[in-house]
Amino acid sequence: MTFTILPAVDVVNGQAVRLDQGEAGTEKSYGTPLESALRWQEQGAEWLHFVDLDAAFNRGSNHELMAEITRQLDIKVELTGGIRDDASLERALATGATRVNIGTAALEKPEWIADVIRRHGEKIAVDIAVRLENGEWRTKGNGWVSDGGDLWEVLERLDSQGCSRFVVTDVSKDGTLTGPNVDLLRDVAAATDAPIVASGGISTLEDVLGLAKYQDEGIDSVIIGKALYEHRFTLAEALEAVEKLG
């Protein structure tokens, strides 16, 4: 099975942006989301990681724009940001997105997420953003600012509820181009049978290939944002490199 690369398009106020360590106010704009999404599609992406940051930060929504773009694309879309109840979930699923990621609500509403996982199965992934605090990995919600509990306890609960996939981000790495936290990702993969999507810190092709080595441990995908926008390497180069691994 080929390692999957998901180029990211994060949206703030109708623009494609990247943040530094997920912090509001650190946005750097990269044009329109449609331009970015079409560029990644043209370069051979099979998936797009599409994030409504305004919704994630509880300060608005780019839903209509993102729904329209999702409908225009020929590739699979993983949609995330601000999906916290049945209404926002149904709206996200109605865009035709292949997968919907849920973050904060998976931490704060355990009974609801259990029901969502039961009803929608593989269409749902859970975003687990974490930060190391006083030697403990703590989960983060609401735009990565609120505490959602101990990582391993949260993971055990969601795993027992049947979550089909986890997207794991070390917040301190996101948007920094300093390399992924491979040890953390491997530890999480070892604690669940669900596949892991790695997120945060990718800077070089070596970073991508370094993660792809651990497919047999359960890390089967990676989200890449700033490295592509800052031209550290092209999406085509990354896709070719992982294809050679087989």
UniProtKB/Swiss-Prot annotation:
<dbReference type="GO" id="GO:0005737">
    <property type="term" value="C:cytoplasm"/>
</dbReference>
<dbReference type="GO" id="GO:0000105">
    <property type="term" value="P:L-histidine biosynthetic process"/>
</dbReference>
<keyword id="KW-0413">Isomerase</keyword>
<comment type="pathway">
    <text>Amino-acid biosynthesis; L-histidine biosynthesis; L-histidine from 5-phospho-alpha-D-ribose 1-diphosphate: step 4/9.</text>
</comment>
<dbReference type="Pfam" id="PF00977">
    <property type="entry name" value="His_biosynth"/>
</dbReference>
<comment type="similarity">
    <text>Belongs to the HisA/HisF family.</text>
</comment>
<dbReference type="InterPro" id="IPR013785">
    <property type="entry name" value="Aldolase_TIM"/>
</dbReference>
<keyword id="KW-0368">Histidine biosynthesis</keyword>
<dbReference type="InterPro" id="IPR006062">
    <property type="entry name" value="His_biosynth"/>
</dbReference>
<dbReference type="InterPro" id="IPR011060">
    <property type="entry name" value="RibuloseP-bd_barrel"/>
</dbReference>
<dbReference type="GO" id="GO:0003949">
    <property type="term" value="F:1-(5-phosphoribosyl)-5-[(5-phosphoribosylamino)methylideneamino]imidazole-4-carboxamide isomerase activity"/>
</dbReference>
<keyword id="KW-0963">Cytoplasm</keyword>
<dbReference type="GO" id="GO:0004640">
    <property type="term" value="F:phosphoribosylanthranilate isomerase activity"/>
</dbReference>
<dbReference type="InterPro" id="IPR010188">
    <property type="entry name" value="HisA/PriA_Actinobacteria"/>
</dbReference>
<feature type="active site" description="Proton acceptor">
    <location>
        <position position="10"/>
    </location>
</feature>
<dbReference type="InterPro" id="IPR044524">
    <property type="entry name" value="Isoase_HisA-like"/>
</dbReference>
<protein>
    <recommendedName>
        <fullName>1-(5-phosphoribosyl)-5-[(5-phosphoribosylamino)methylideneamino] imidazole-4-carboxamide isomerase</fullName>
        <ecNumber>5.3.1.16</ecNumber>
    </recommendedName>
</protein>
<dbReference type="InterPro" id="IPR023016">
    <property type="entry name" value="Isoase_HisA-like_bact"/>
</dbReference>
<keyword id="KW-0028">Amino-acid biosynthesis</keyword>
<dbReference type="GO" id="GO:0000162">
    <property type="term" value="P:L-tryptophan biosynthetic process"/>
</dbReference>
